[in-house]
Amino acid sequence: MKELVFLKFGGSLITDKTQPYTPLLDRMDDIALQIATTLQTQPNLRLVIGHGAGSFGHVAASEYKTRAGYPRPSPLMHRERDETEENYWKGFAEVWYQASSLNRYVMKALHKANVRAISLPPSSSVIATEGKVSVWETTPIRMGLSARIVPVIFGDVVFDEIRGGTILSTEDLFMHLARALSPERILLAGLEAAVWEDFPARTKKIEKITPRTFDEFSRGIGKSEGADVTGGMKSKVAQMLELVQYNHELSVQIFSGTEPGNIVHTLTGETLGTVITMS
């Protein structure tokens, strides 16, 4: 029986988020090899990969406030663009360039490991409305999965009907794609071994989060270390809780991608880190 899994490796896992534009190439290679190994031994696994922008996209996005957007003028207005608007769109293009640059490193690692993967940039296929996906032509993703190709998406700039432009994280994209494709599992690999009740002390691991228990943990769940314009850990958990309430059969894991073999272990069904489920 075929199983569809979404796997994200966070920007903090594949870049040094404290050093702008610094890819962690050895780690990318290791992750790619783990994915290749798993696909060879699990012929029924269908995989969609997403990755964060790390120290590539987040630096420029923070400088230019790209996620907040710049409201579109009426098409009936004839006016010169002011300096603020010019600067916004300059930043929009810069974030696109940096996010795409990181994606090339990821794709190189996957292809070096003989993973049949293709990049499907959200900037060329997604339209947002007020920071959420409103239009996405997902047929290439579906056809890729049918051909046993691994579609790769990533945190990217997109045009927005209200804001003009914005940034969508991989989790933002998964929010839409999970409703369209109904994966059995979503795996979020990062630096943290789990979600912590007392971040940044990291002494109280949360084994499981459900909609009923989230409130008791939410105060201690922290943001990400380093630049992150898309919300950090608490935002990720909240988004995944929304998805498990939409699809009660969905299971989400948040775990460390730095430990040897963890990608293989989770892809093949082992439970690591923190689990998010409906009950």
Q: What are the residue ranges of the model-derived segments?
A:
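Nucleotide/pyrophosphate-binding catalytic subdomain
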Residues: 1-262
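Short, basic/aromatic-enriched C-terminal tail that caps enzymatic domains
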Residues: 262-279
